[in-house]
Amino acid sequence: LEWDKQRLAAIHNEVKDIKIPYTKSGNIPYYLDANGRYENKDRLMKLLDFADKIGALERIILLEEPFPEEYKVDVSDIPARLAADESAHSDKDAIERIELGYGAIALKPIAKTMSMSLKIAKIAHEKGIPCFCADLTVNPIMVDWNKNVAARLAPLPGMRIGVLESNGHQNYVNWQKMK
């Protein structure tokens, strides 16, 4: 928690005054992926209270998968848009997370299959929940597949453009050769 606070503060201090055309606020949005490391709401709220104190809370456009998958609790009172990722394996899982108050769903057309991703996207759309694509460290050709899906999704609230998480270049030594 303390490391997360300090990292958020360091990033916020570096970019808080930079303006961009891609958000409605003109500010750089923060996309935090906790990968299930917050064991409960109280602990997560300590991070978000800190974010509010330093002026960073309003910049958090997504807080992805803050809790372990088995932690099923109403999150509608959390002052940031929580995104389900690893906990939304299926359309049934996505419905459950939406009912718990999650405000976005990560689609993974490569990992969750295209057909399941489209089912999840349809359900989320019907319930007014935005989706975005995440790449699960896929290779360059598969990133293009995700771009194809992402291009058909509405922008996340507060954004003027779509969002696609892509981190394969950080995990493949020969990324440039694979292009």
For each feature predicted by the language model, list its residue ranges.
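Catalytic core of soluble alpha/beta enzymes
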Residues: L1-T137, I141-V143
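Flexible C-terminal active-site loop/helix
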Residues: T137-K179
